[in-house]
Regions:
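Glycine-rich phosphate-binding loops that contact phosphosugars or nucleotide phosphates
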Residues: 1-130
């Protein structure tokens, strides 16, 4: 989200983007009242609209909080992209698009996810003529 709101390579207009992982008040209140598996889906219900894109990151592809967010995204007509590892898990089956890092190593999967995030930012800037 930071590279989209701020910048990835060059100065440009800010792009609408939010990380659903950063508001500790929301995370703890939703986690306590609804369960940790609802921390992202509840936010998506409040903030999401059909023109949005949800990117969910799960090393295994089976994180319940990510899977629930993908289900809400589908209900709201939001395009979803899963970044996973191993065999892609359930996220690979229920997201609209999936990028699976073919590794069993959590560290390698997470490192690849960082690289993939930067590549996506570069593609977005190039496709939107921001470079």
């Amino acid at each position: 989200a930071a590279e989209l709101v701020g910048r990835f390579r060059n100065d440009r207009r800010a792009l609408k983007s939010i990380a659903l992982t950063t508001d500790t008040s929301i995370l703890t209140s939703v986690g306590n009242d609804y369960g940790f598996d609802q921390i992202f889906s509840r936010q998506l219900q409040a903030l999401g609209s059909p023109e949005d894109i949800l990117i969910g990151i799960s090393t295994s592809g089976n994180s319940r909080n990510i899977l629930n967010a993908f289900k809400v995204a589908s209900d709201l007509g939001i395009t979803s992209i899963a970044l996973t590892g191993k065999d892609g898990g359930i996220a690979n089956k229920i997201s609209d698009y999936s990028i699976v890092v073919d590794s069993e190593s959590t560290a390698r999967i997470q490192e690849a996810h960082i690289l993939i995030g930067h590549i996506l930012c570069e593609i977005i800037e190039e496709q939107l003529q921001f470079v």
